[in-house]
Amino acid sequence: MIELLFLLLPIAAAYGWYMGRRSAKKDQDDISNKLSRDYVTGVNFLLSNQTDKAVDLFLDMLQKQEIENEIESHSQFEAELTLGNLFRSRGEVDRALRIHQALDLSPNYTFEQKLLAKQQLARDFMVVGFFDRAENLYILLVDEPEFAENALQQLLVIYQKTKEWKKAVNIAEKLAKIKPQENNIELAQCYCEYSQSLEPESAVEKRSVLQKALSVSPTCVRASLLLANLAMLDGQYQQAVKILENVLEQNPDYTGEILLPLKHCYEELNQLDNFELFLIRAGQIINNDEVELALAKLIEEKDGKSAAQAKLYQQLTKKPSTLIFHRFMQYQIDDAEDGRGKESLILLHKMVGERIKQTSPYRCTNCGYQIHKLLWNCPSCRQWESIKPVSNQEHN
């Protein structure tokens, strides 16, 4: 609604000029009062969240002013531009396109006004998915200082939607030069996407691109995971271990994502004891159920189920956890004798498991979107690097 209120500022200006002309030309207080009431009514509709009614009323006011041809040139441009925007806001993009195209082609307006028309015309094309036409307009606007940043942002949106990652990287680099703190995360993610779009045999270029991602965003866990994967494909397991273990310092929230590949590397190196040492160190730094479960599994493989069960029991007494309790119960079931007691354990284990399934393991920290797998771009709010594993506290 706030955006729509700003959108209506030109209407207010045109309306004020129009009312002044009407009052100066003739004594028509009844008409003036009618329009004044309409404007106030429209604002009230907005404030009461009746957006559709407000848009209808403001459209009617603008169209009446246009029909009577009593708006000065500058105000008429703003009014028509806004009229097109209002049509777009209510889904009538074809009418918005006609209005904005007419403004762009009209010989009656200045170069700066036509740039505004081009900007809104590009937005119309974006809404209907004509990305090639929007792209052409935004490329023109990039050369105009007042429009450049917005045009670059929209071009980046287009290239991300069309998955043209080399172009996306080029635009993201320009945005990062303008505002590094706001754009470096997105630039790093564009580097990651571009690296994944390259052919498998382009390993050298992939590494170079991923190193760029880490240079602009040192906490980019995705780049580290991709670099580790490249190292593993080349059989460079010690290098992969170094990269993966660094994630604990990079962003400990993602420690659970490295456990399987890290264990695989240590298995290939025949160094599972070092994997155990890493898990112990990680458990001292962060409270992460996956770390504790991985450690219990390792203890089971080395020393048997009883030792693993004792480890989980110790953990439960310190920090109760649904996930750890669920695994602990499985050990209890394995040891229990047949009978009602075991049946009760199986039922309880199943109920706890169903509760765990209902909890999404990942959540967007920006909009709250929940999902069952890790994505680097939120499908809901389109924010990069905002989806993270749900914490132990949220799980429990």
Swiss-Prot record:
<comment type="similarity">
    <text>Belongs to the LapB family.</text>
</comment>
<dbReference type="Pfam" id="PF13176">
    <property type="entry name" value="TPR_7"/>
</dbReference>
<dbReference type="InterPro" id="IPR019734">
    <property type="entry name" value="TPR_rpt"/>
</dbReference>
<dbReference type="InterPro" id="IPR030865">
    <property type="entry name" value="LapB"/>
</dbReference>
<dbReference type="GO" id="GO:0046890">
    <property type="term" value="P:regulation of lipid biosynthetic process"/>
</dbReference>
<feature type="repeat" description="TPR 3">
    <location>
        <begin position="149"/>
        <end position="182"/>
    </location>
</feature>
<dbReference type="Pfam" id="PF14559">
    <property type="entry name" value="TPR_19"/>
</dbReference>
<feature type="repeat" description="TPR 4">
    <location>
        <begin position="221"/>
        <end position="254"/>
    </location>
</feature>
<dbReference type="GO" id="GO:0008653">
    <property type="term" value="P:lipopolysaccharide metabolic process"/>
</dbReference>
<keyword id="KW-0479">Metal-binding</keyword>
<feature type="binding site">
    <location>
        <position position="364"/>
    </location>
    <ligand>
        <name>Fe cation</name>
    </ligand>
</feature>
<keyword id="KW-0472">Membrane</keyword>
<feature type="binding site">
    <location>
        <position position="378"/>
    </location>
    <ligand>
        <name>Fe cation</name>
    </ligand>
</feature>
<dbReference type="InterPro" id="IPR051012">
    <property type="entry name" value="CellSynth/LPSAsmb/PSIAsmb"/>
</dbReference>
<keyword id="KW-0802">TPR repeat</keyword>
<protein>
    <recommendedName>
        <fullName>Lipopolysaccharide assembly protein B</fullName>
    </recommendedName>
</protein>
<keyword id="KW-0997">Cell inner membrane</keyword>
<comment type="function">
    <text>Modulates cellular lipopolysaccharide (LPS) levels by regulating LpxC, which is involved in lipid A biosynthesis. May act by modulating the proteolytic activity of FtsH towards LpxC. May also coordinate assembly of proteins involved in LPS synthesis at the plasma membrane.</text>
</comment>
<dbReference type="GO" id="GO:0009898">
    <property type="term" value="C:cytoplasmic side of plasma membrane"/>
</dbReference>
<feature type="repeat" description="TPR 2">
    <location>
        <begin position="77"/>
        <end position="109"/>
    </location>
</feature>
<dbReference type="Pfam" id="PF18073">
    <property type="entry name" value="Zn_ribbon_LapB"/>
</dbReference>
<feature type="transmembrane region" description="Helical">
    <location>
        <begin position="1"/>
        <end position="20"/>
    </location>
</feature>
<keyword id="KW-1003">Cell membrane</keyword>
<feature type="binding site">
    <location>
        <position position="381"/>
    </location>
    <ligand>
        <name>Fe cation</name>
    </ligand>
</feature>
<feature type="repeat" description="TPR 1">
    <location>
        <begin position="35"/>
        <end position="68"/>
    </location>
</feature>
<keyword id="KW-0408">Iron</keyword>
<keyword id="KW-0812">Transmembrane</keyword>
<dbReference type="InterPro" id="IPR041166">
    <property type="entry name" value="Rubredoxin_2"/>
</dbReference>
<feature type="binding site">
    <location>
        <position position="367"/>
    </location>
    <ligand>
        <name>Fe cation</name>
    </ligand>
</feature>
<dbReference type="GO" id="GO:0005506">
    <property type="term" value="F:iron ion binding"/>
</dbReference>
<keyword id="KW-0677">Repeat</keyword>
<dbReference type="InterPro" id="IPR011990">
    <property type="entry name" value="TPR-like_helical_dom_sf"/>
</dbReference>
<feature type="topological domain" description="Cytoplasmic">
    <location>
        <begin position="21"/>
        <end position="396"/>
    </location>
</feature>
<keyword id="KW-1133">Transmembrane helix</keyword>
